[in-house]
Amino acid sequence: MTYWDSAAILRVYVKEPDSDVFERLLARGDGPIQVSTIAWVEILCALHRKARVGDLRPDQADSALDKYHPDSAAGRILHMGYGDDVVAEAGRIMALNFRQERSIPIRSLDLIHLATAIAGRAEALVTTDARLRRLASLARLRVLP
């Protein structure tokens, strides 16, 4: 199973220049994908931000949500909870990061995504974030695309 961060999954539901890459990746998957329950909040905020600055019309934001909900309800998207296992994994990842000669700067929510992926035993992480990609590689998690 693959874990998708919110920016990656959003590219499936909101057209971006590289959306086709993520659509193909999702289509060739072998089952449901994992996302953090926190990703839902990030998706809502991203859609609101895109609508507010004029990158999306409000009806396009609604359409993205209308597409996401059935995929989630059908079990194609598994929402992984935020619990003690994720917190412990985040601590382990940061301990590994601190031991590096040059640690990788990481935002809190990105660390939660990575820790959730590892705690959920994901085989790979789908993200576009350069720092998250580097930290996932350090934690020995395969990164896509």
Predicted features along the sequence, with ranges:
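Hydrophobic/aromatic ligand-binding patch that stacks against planar heteroaromatic rings
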Residues: 25, 116, 135
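Active-site neighborhoods of divalent-metal-dependent phosphate/nucleic-acid chemistry enzymes
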Residues: 77-128
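Active-site-proximal, substrate-binding regions of enzyme catalytic domains
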Residues: 38-97, 138
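Short glycine-/small-residue-rich flexible loop motifs, especially phosphate/cofactor-binding loops
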Residues: 69, 114, 133
